[in-house]
Structures are given as C-alpha cells and as structure tokens.
C-alpha cells in the first residue's frame, strides 16, 4: 500500500517539509500531494477532506490518517523501523524525542519574525530579544547534539 503525504507549498510550509524530509531520509516510498495554501475556501475544503485539523501535513496510509508533522514522523518511525529515524539506544532516542518536541512546540518569536519563505530575498533583519534568545537556544541544542552524538551519523 502506498503512503500519501499531503503537504502545502514546499517554499512556505516548514511543517510540511518535516515529514517529507524524514520519508526521503528514511528511503520510504510515498506519493506526494500538494494543496495550495492561502488560496481560499476550495483549497481549505481539500485540506479538511484529508486532515481533521484543517492543516497540512497529513499522511494517509490506507484507512489510517495521521496529521501533525511530529505525529507523522512518530508513525513512520514505528511503521518502518528499518529506516532508523530514531536512535536505537533508548537514552539517545529519549534525548532526540525531547529535542524534537522542543523544536516542534517552541521558538514562537523566531517563527513569528522569520517565517519560512524560500523565495524572499535574504537581507539584514532586526530581531527581538526573544527571537535572538530562540536562536541562541537552537545553537545550544545543535552544539550539544553534535558533541554528544556526532559519531552516530550526519544528522543531529
């Protein structure tokens, strides 16, 4: 049975890109279906037809629908353990899940001030103290993970 990942625009939806990247990195076959975002009621209905939250991404696996990027990644990690999406060691896996949850639910100031838009020209930006604190915390997380777990592969 083919998995179908329903996503928004890859240029604007970092939430959509998370499970897309996990599926690609895991070598898991899937069909990609893109629904335009911010285009009106018809597209909102198309999203609601596949996602109870009315948001993308959503993963369809036969009769199973999973929505929310982190829930999708958890599902595919369980469904395809050979893909190695989570570390095998329980302590390392717990650490990875904790960081994933923090990345998933935190950093509101940074998300607000630096939303994903791959087509926007890059330039100097004045960030709030909260956004700078978010960036500093992300730097701490990444540094810690690379120092502790770099031997495990190229990913944090």
Task: Name every feature range the model reports, one short phrase each.
Residues 1-127:
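GST-like domain detector, emphasizing the conserved glutathione-binding G-site
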Residues 107-156:
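GST-like fold's C-terminal all-alpha helical module
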């Amino acid at each position: 049975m083919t998995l179908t990942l329903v996503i928004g625009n890859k240029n604007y939806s970092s939430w959509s890109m998370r499970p897309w990247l996990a599926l690609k990195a895991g070598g898991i076959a899937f069909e990609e279906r893109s629904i335009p975002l911010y285009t009106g009621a018809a597209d909102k209905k198309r999203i609601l037809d596949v996602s109870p939250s009315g948001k993308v991404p959503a993963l369809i696996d036969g009769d199973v629908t999973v929505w929310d990027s982190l829930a999708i990644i958890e599902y595919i990690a369980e469904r395809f353990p050979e893909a190695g999406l989570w570390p095998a060691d329980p302590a390392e896996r717990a650490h990875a899940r904790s960081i994933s949850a923090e990345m998933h639910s935190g950093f509101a100031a940074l998300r607000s001030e630096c939303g994903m838009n791959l087509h926007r020209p890059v330039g100097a930006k004045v960030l709030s103290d909260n956004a700078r604190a978010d960036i500093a915390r992300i730097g701490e997380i990444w540094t810690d993970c690379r120092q502790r777990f770099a031997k495990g592969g190229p990913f944090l």
